[in-house]
Amino acid sequence: MTVHTEYKRNQIIASSEIDDLIFMTKPQEWSFEEQKEIRDKLVREAFYFHYNRNEEYRNYCINQHVSDNLHTIDEIPVFPTSVFKYKKLHTVTAEDIENWYTSSGTRGVKSHIARDRLSIERLLGSVNFGMKYVGDWFEHQMELINLGPDRFNTNNIWFKYVMSLVELLYPTEFTVDNDKIDFEKTVKHLFRIKNSKKDICLIGPPFFVYLLCQYMKENNIEFKGGDRVHIITGGGWKSNQNDSLDRADFNQLLMDTFQLDKINQIRDTFNQVELNTCFFEDEFQRKHVPPWVYARALDPETLKPVADGEIGLLSYMDASSTAYPAFIVTDDIGIVKEIREPDPYPGVTVEIVRRLNTRAQKGCALSMANVIQKNIKD
């Protein structure tokens, strides 16, 4: 399908090579090796940017015996996301911070992340970039129904904000207020858009989509989506883990409820507040890491990269963030895979398997966090 997606380009300031990459290109434009070369260059540039402008991060690097004379980007010091729970770390000046965003806080203390205008614009660009894995429509060809609040009512909770950004790409109806779904309104818009002959994109947390399916089943609502409905989830099940379905069962529930033609009409996304990029799935439901982000799986105890395709502690270096150094080790255990030609979607994929759960693994992460706390002073 030809690329037709239009976003508010007059709101975007394309200031560099990375902005051209994020805002003006498609995911399938480069080979695996070309993506690798692009990633190396952009991550290096991001490291130099933060190293030279952020004294706290530079001191941390020096403590790790790392200067700005890198041999490989694997040498770039990363830190656990828990640092952002206790330290407001930012590279840009306080005057340039557009907003502070928080995690959902389902696991206790919230992370606080500063973002300037350019970082926010690049996040929007990553959503537009990722949507091209799903399909490409003129603005008048599709409408979205968001099982969440609009971006003015997210209370700075990061994932809600990320999901609300689609409003800037396509006409969008929001059907959740104060974390309560208006089921009647949602169903009304489903049928309205269907009758308008436009395609429909339903987005929201998997638990909310699950609740909508239950409502439609209980009320005997039959909806024949065919090939015109696309469902995009994100954010995980969080505090609703007891109600969670495995991916195969969840796929089947959506296929049955919305009478979809193909399973590839269902996509999941990944983002976290400490990461400035949203990862989208391709038609095979594999989450792709864009070429401006370097993803690795690390040994939880040594923090050394494991072999391609092996399970480890997920770490990201995101070159799109100017507000803060987005060089992080997460609490997620997962798998990073290199996808090469002749696959139609060459690049790097990530699969999140589970959270850290052993005392040894958490101890390693906490030990690393303590080291950083001593070297990044308030």
UniProtKB/Swiss-Prot annotation:
This enzyme's EC code(s): 6.2.1.19
EC supergroup of this enzyme: ligase
Species of provenance: Aliivibrio fischeri
Name of the protein in question: Long-chain-fatty-acid--luciferin-component ligase
Lineage summary: Bacteria, Pseudomonadati, Pseudomonadota, Gammaproteobacteria, Vibrionales
InterPro entries for the chain: ANL_N_sf, LuxE, LuxE_bac
Family: Belongs to the LuxE family.
Pfam families, alphabetized: LuxE
Function: Acyl-protein synthetase activates tetradecanoic acid. It is a component of the fatty acid reductase complex responsible for converting tetradecanoic acid to the aldehyde which serves as substrate in the luciferase-catalyzed reaction.
Reaction catalysed by this enzyme: a long-chain fatty acid + L-cysteinyl-[protein] + ATP = an S-(long-chain fatty acyl)-L-cysteinyl-[protein] + AMP + diphosphate
